[in-house]
């Protein structure tokens, strides 16, 4: 159940975008994401120009996501609305077929994971990304998930490139197969309540 399509989409809403933990997406989440991304990209340093840029990007993203997924136009995107939007707009498609706002979100997320800026998400960055959202008592659990996620080419390259990350993310939210390696993109999953 933890790797079912339904749970993966719930996971994305709950742990990736519902920053204020109120159970739905709204404008505030994207305002908080602007600050979060600015601080992560600056490795803790606050840059007002980068923040202004991130505010603009996240405001535009919220407006696009609200247009695509806020079906009842109440200023909130519930988990069910988000799932319906993903099903309508993403299921069965590769990254290239996704709406522009989804592509932007995925690219911005990769930037927050690639802490050292080398263009790859290595095991060290993967570990940090995983523990920022979930509790683990053993690094082996995280490392095993990374090993299942990576192909031989990823391992030779030293990590997951942006292009590979984009395709993995696309599979994570659009592929119903619980056994595809993309289900490990965000680490070992637990069932979202």
Swiss-Prot record:
Temperature and thermostability: Stable at wide temperature range (4-100 degrees Celsius). Heating does not cause degradation, but leads to polymerization. The polymer content is highest at around 70 degrees Celsius.
GO molecular function ontology, one term from the record: calcium ion binding
Protein name: Sarcoplasmic calcium-binding protein
Residues of the EF-hand domain: 16-40, 57-92, 101-136
Chain residues that bind Ca(2+) 3: 114, 116, 118, 125
Binding residues for Ca(2+) 1: 18, 20, 22, 24, 29
Keyword Nucleotide-binding attached: no
This protein's record includes keyword Metal-binding: yes
High-level lineage: Eukaryota, Metazoa, Ecdysozoa, Arthropoda, Crustacea
């Amino acid at each position: 159940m933890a790797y079912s399509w339904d749970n993966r989409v719930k996971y994305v809403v709950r742990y990736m975008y519902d920053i204020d933990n109120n159970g739905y997406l709204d404008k505030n989440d994207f305002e908080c994401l602007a600050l979060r991304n600015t601080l992560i990209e600056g490795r803790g340093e606050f840059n007002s120009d980068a923040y202004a840029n991130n505010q603009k990007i996240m405001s535009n993203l919220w407006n696009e996501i609200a247009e695509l997924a806020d079906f009842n136009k109440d200023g909130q995107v519930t988990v069910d609305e988000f799932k319906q939007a993903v099903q309508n707009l993403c299921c069965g498609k590769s990254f290239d077929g996704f709406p522009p706002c989804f592509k932007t979100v995925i690219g911005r997320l990769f930037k927050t994971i690639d802490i050292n800026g080398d263009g790859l998400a290595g095991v060290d960055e993967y570990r940090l990304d995983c523990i920022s959202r979930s509790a683990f008592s053993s690094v082996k659990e995280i490392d095993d998930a990374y090993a299942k996620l990576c192909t031989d080419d990823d391992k030779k390259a030293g990590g997951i490139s942006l292009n590979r990350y984009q395709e993995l993310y696309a599979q994570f939210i659009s592929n119903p197969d619980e056994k595809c390696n993309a289900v490990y993109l965000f680490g070992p999953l637990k069932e979202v309540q």
